[in-house]
Amino acid sequence: LVPAFHQSLFGHSDKTVVVANIGGMSNISILRPAQAPLGFDCGPGNALLDAWCELHTGQAFDVNGEWGASGEVHEDWLVDALSEPFFALPPPKSTGRDLFNRDWLSNWLASHGQTDGPQADPQQARDVQATLCELSARAIAMAIEQHAPQASDVIVCGGGALNADLMRRIAEQLPSMAVAPSDAWG
């Protein structure tokens, strides 16, 4: 139902548009001219970011992505996270907190010799947040590049659209596309 709703709001007769909805998980709707919309989950959206942020800052979410933006992405951790089998599945596919949850996060960190407790080094905690943000951005970008490389616009809705760091990272991954929050579309 969501891709059809997105089609009615944002569909165009002359160009392909992608709507990325970033809530706990991220999903996209691919809106092609004269074709039925295609929608599927990409992977984690805010769920891992919010869980990690709350554990280390006491805040329910990373306001504007400022805390995560102060960290450094660990590329080796990111490559490992992207090896999660879900990312290789073809659409239509669905995921949720049954996969991308605190247990997944703990196991991922442990595989890199990191702790997930609040006693973690403050810089390491920011680096984890930055890496998780990059994971969400790359999961969305990979899905778009693979299934809608001709898209001209990526319209972002959901809570993730309020995370400036996440929006910046998505735009960096998709330089040939205009990435903007849905409120910019009216």
Question: Model-predicted segments: where are they?
Answer:
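A short glycine/serine-rich beta->alpha loop
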Residues: 37-39, 123, 181-186
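Glycine-rich phosphate-binding/hydrolytic loop that grips phosphoryl groups
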Residues: 1, 130, 134, 183-186
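Glycine-rich phosphate-binding loop plus the immediately following alpha-helix
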Residues: 1-10, 18-89
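Conserved beta-strand segments of alpha/beta enzyme cores
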Residues: 18, 178-180
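A general structural motif
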Residues: 14-16, 151
